[in-house]
Amino acid sequence: MAFPKKKLQGLVAATITPMTEDGEINFSVIGQYVDYLVKEQGVKNIFVNGTTGEGLSLSISERRQVAEEWVTKGKDKLDQVIIHVGALSLKESQELAQHAAEIGADGIAVIAPFFLKPWTKDILINFLKEVAAAAPALPFYYYHIPALTGVKIRAEELLDGILDKIPTFQGLKFSDTDLLDFGQCVDQNRQQQFAFLFGVDEQLLSALVMGATGAVGSTYNYLGKKTNQMLEAFERKDFSLALNYQFCIQRFINFVVKLGFGVSQTKAIMTLVSGISMGPPRLPLQKASREFTDSAEAKLKSLDFLSFTDLKDGNLEAGS
């Protein structure tokens, strides 16, 4: 049975795949990206080739190369590198899973196939089981994101008896707003040491109350430090301060969501905040507009998110 070297917990950055202006992967900045996450954001776990990383817009060869680069550059700097290996093809998922094991990744994650969909728990489990078996020494995580996959099988149902079918199962990335489903996942698996990683950044504090052990998200690339401060306040049981941090983070997310927010805009914000060029997204996504970037920068400044200083009381309490 596969056990992680230590339980995956805390913040996990869903990494962006940097690209050049002509749409090729820019491997040259990944080392700098690792250092930025660790030193500036205090984030030492990553989730590679997921939604934020445009994993399903990359070729299998590219996904392998990206995974290798993150593992190599993260050696002795990152705590855990989780590789998303989900694909529409079982064979491709198995190939990516085996490759992740070969390069020394710390775990693999898989979404449900979303074109020819599994409509029952048993069918989905059978698919996941075959992928997990391709990397029997690696911890396996299910990536639950029904809004994108269209697979509406509840995570609570999926987890019931899952270790009997997938002995390497170690947890899930829960990217849905259904806190009833999430809460029941936690409540019904208290005897297990599963990692319950919440994937809706703007609702993280609610998930922590429900028992989340960590979080995977795109905003932890550039708001990791602020979110870590929220986690620290929560651990100290300073719930008022934790709530203020969450509200402040929500102000920014609410602002950009109203402008139109996705992978393209995440790349633009990360470039702005980190100073590392993330480049454009790959088609069919379009590059974020200059108007969006300018508006996002102004909002970040108004919330003091570009200074990397502690939030002031006035900044916490005032709706900017």
UniProtKB/Swiss-Prot annotation:
Catalytic function, reaction form: aceneuramate = aldehydo-N-acetyl-D-mannosamine + pyruvate
BP GO terms, sorted: carbohydrate metabolic process; N-acetylneuraminate catabolic process
Principal EC category: lyase
Predominant cellular place of this UniProt entry's protein: cytoplasm
GO molecular function, one term: N-acetylneuraminate lyase activity
CDD domains in the cross-refs: NAL (cd00954)
Known EC number: 4.1.3.3
Xref: InterPro entries: Aldolase_TIM, DapA-like, NanA
Lineage top rank: taxon: Eukaryota
Residues forming the catalytic site: 143 (proton donor), 173 (schiff-base intermediate with substrate)
Biochemical pathway: Amino-sugar metabolism; N-acetylneuraminate degradation
Keyword annotations: Carbohydrate metabolism, Cytoplasm, Lyase, Schiff base
Chain positions recorded as aceneuramate binding sites: 51-52, 175, 199, 201-202, 218
Job of this protein: Catalyzes the cleavage of N-acetylneuraminic acid (sialic acid) to form pyruvate and N-acetylmannosamine via a Schiff base intermediate. It prevents sialic acids from being recycled and returning to the cell surface. Involved in the N-glycolylneuraminic acid (Neu5Gc) degradation pathway.
Assembly, per entry: Homotetramer.
Similarity comment: Belongs to the DapA family. NanA subfamily.
Name this polypeptide is given: N-acetylneuraminate lyase
Gene that encodes it: NPL
